Amino acid sequence: MGYPKEGETIQIHSYKHNGLIHRIWNETTILKSTEMCVIGANDRTMVTESDGRTWITREPAICYFHARQWFNVIGMLREDGVHYYCNISSPFAYDGEAIKYIDYDLDVKVFPDMTYNILDEDEYDDHRKAMNYPKEIDSILRDYLNTLLHWIHQRQGPFAPEFVDMWYERYLRYTK
């Protein structure tokens, strides 16, 4: 599979289970990259939706991908603290130009005080039926939703108190 080089700027591609593109983030700077984990950052990057619409992200974000976890985490730096958006997804793959993963609709929005909301459960159920997610996938996704919630409660990995600030400081070195 390989993995991107630190300092490299790459795209992030999100797909749906049926193989169709869901969303593309145009530019993310790689801050750490190993076979197991990729950490990237972006700020005001263009995002292209599956229907061709585009928009620009509003704030700096630290992106966390793991090769064995069925979720990814985006920590967004806002005036009132770090907000997290977590996608229940396949583990990432890297093809030499982009980090790629399958977005499985379930999301968790985490606030600076570490309270959270689970989002899009109806969309998940609709897509699970429409795209015939195998029972094994459904079971894996539900297990990893619980793993993600455990990480949030324990402030593990990207939810550790200084994680996002530390990686944002490193990102600033690349933007000078």
UniProtKB/Swiss-Prot annotation:
Mg(2+) 2 binds at residues 105, 107, 120, 123. Belongs to the Ntdp family. Its cofactor is Mg(2+). It is an enzyme of class 3 (hydrolase). GO terms for molecular function: magnesium ion binding; nucleoside diphosphate phosphatase activity; ribonucleoside triphosphate phosphatase activity. SUPFAM superfamilies: FomD-like. This is Nucleoside triphosphate/diphosphate phosphatase. It comes from Bacillus subtilis (strain 168). Mg(2+) 1 binds at residues 87, 103, 107. The gene is ygaC. Signal peptide: none annotated. Its EC number is 3.6.1.15, 3.6.1.6.
